[in-house]
Amino acid sequence: VTVEYRIDPARTAEFVAAMRHLRQIRRRDGAFMWELFHDVEAQGRMVESFMVESWIEHLRQHERVTVADRAVSEMIRAFHIGGEPPKVTHLVAAER
């Protein structure tokens, strides 16, 4: 799963600090890989990437969201600028 955020570059350090909370949530809920990337060619473009065991497991993650988790997500979304929400992409392995 990738989530693309557009943020004010002046708030990058603050955004990265907030994303540490989301990393803990993703890991707790089964992500075995989590990274946050910045685009060196597009200032303010940040991409969260995480992997879970399966599509079903990812769907289950949505069912396990707590009130506290939702508050963290909303805090992070507040960094996102632009008219559209953060772009979410779901990729599944072509072969297993």
Language model region names:
Residues 10-15, 57-60:
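Short, conserved charged micro-motifs
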Residues 20-47:
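Short, glycine- and small/hydrophobic-rich beta-strand elements in well-ordered beta-sheets
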Residues 24-33, 51-87:
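An amphipathic, aromatic/His-enriched active-site/gating alpha helix that lines ligand/cofactor pockets
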Residues 37-43, 80, 92-94:
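A short beta-turn/loop motif at secondary-structure boundaries
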Residues 1-8:
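Short glycine-/aliphatic-rich beta-strand segments at the starts of folded cytosolic domains
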